């Protein structure tokens, strides 16, 4: 009924609902929250209300401080040159890949299950070829025909980056 009230295609409202649900899971997780930085257009809409729009994906940066096994010398900093940061990011990329596979994907699956949400399929992009950002797709069970809106795909895309700064420079 929200779609009718706002004059918006119902599948867009549905997708926005799922984006909010996924954001809720991500940022209520104590083990992740201190290390995540919500970025991009979705943050401008959902967190800061700077723009009014419905969202399709969630852009987050994960601080290298999430990985206790990394020494300070391994972590990129804002005061380093771009080439120095890129070299360090290439070295720690495997940590981000493992985090997506062994932390984020299982976390999403577990939280969805705890909420009683069924028929959700969580798909991790092929990490053997993945570069930054790393992508996790959360396919949700749509209430609407797929052909109702061809450009509204029934999944939420999380793009997790180690490249983006999580602290002011």
Explain the meaning of each model-derived region.
Residues 1-169:
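Compositionally biased terminal segments of proteins
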């Amino acid at each position: 009924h929200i779609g009718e009230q706002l004059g918006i295609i119902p599948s867009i409202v549905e997708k926005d609902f799922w984006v909010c649900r996924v954001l809720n899971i991500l940022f209520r997780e104590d083990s992740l929250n201190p290390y995540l930085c919500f970025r991009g257009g979705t943050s401008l809409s959902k967190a800061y209300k700077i723009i009014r729009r419905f969202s399709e994906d969630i852009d987050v940066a994960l601080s290298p401080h999430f990985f206790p096994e990394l020494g300070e010398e391994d972590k990129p900093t804002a005061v380093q040159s771009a080439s120095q940061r890129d070299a360090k990011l290439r070295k720690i990329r495997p940590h981000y890949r493992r985090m997506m596979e062994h932390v984020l994907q299982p976390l999403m699956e577990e939280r969805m299950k705890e909420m009683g949400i069924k028929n959700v399929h969580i798909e991790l992009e092929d990490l053997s070829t993945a570069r930054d950002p790393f992508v996790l797709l959360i396919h949700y069970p749509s209430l609407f025909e797929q052909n109702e809106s061809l450009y509204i795909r029934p999944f939420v895309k999380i793009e997790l980056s180690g490249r983006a700064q999580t602290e002011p420079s």
